[in-house]
Amino acid sequence: MADTIQSLDQLSALKPAESEAPKHTKKVDKYGRAYATGKRKDAVARVWIKPGAGKILVNAREVDVYFARPVLRMMIQQPLVAAARAGQYDVVCTVAGGGLSGQAGAVRHGLSKALTHFEPELRGVLKKGGFLTRDSRVVERKKYGKAKARRSFQFSKR
């Protein structure tokens, strides 16, 4: 009990413990690919990236074929554009569950996480853009005694 602190001066004189924040390291498999999973609504995407010509495959199909709407394709490209890495990585992903919008969001989330595994220094840029945060908004459940989640049945006064 000899190292009990008796005053504020002793407390302020103490040096902080050497506990650094964990360093993010490059995580790639034996094939040189970075892997991550992304989620959005009910969709789950498994994403692999490796250096390449910028080809994006979704469920073994070109991104232009799988996501016909330009807005969805733009959503997937956002992390690469924000990190100034468009056209530098080949992306292969499998996505299941949900609709097309949820699937595009899941691919975007997984792609962002895979980019940080491949290049940890991009984490700040992607975090600032909000690409690494899991969007927790999901469909509200239906309640009994109601037509839908919040909509009541039609009310007749008489």
Swiss-Prot record:
GO molecular function: RNA binding; structural constituent of ribosome
Family: Belongs to the universal ribosomal protein uS9 family.
Organism: Nitrobacter winogradskyi (strain ATCC 25391 / DSM 10237 / CIP 104748 / NCIMB 11846 / Nb-255)
GO cellular component: cytosolic small ribosomal subunit
Encoding gene, per UniProt annotation: rpsI
Protein name: Small ribosomal subunit protein uS9
One Pfam family hit: Ribosomal_S9
InterPro entries associated with the record: Ribosomal_Su5_D2-typ_SF, Ribosomal_uS9, Ribosomal_uS9_bac/plastid, Ribosomal_uS9_CS, Ribsml_uS5_D2-typ_fold_subgr
Keywords: Ribonucleoprotein, Ribosomal protein
Gene Ontology biological-process annotations: translation
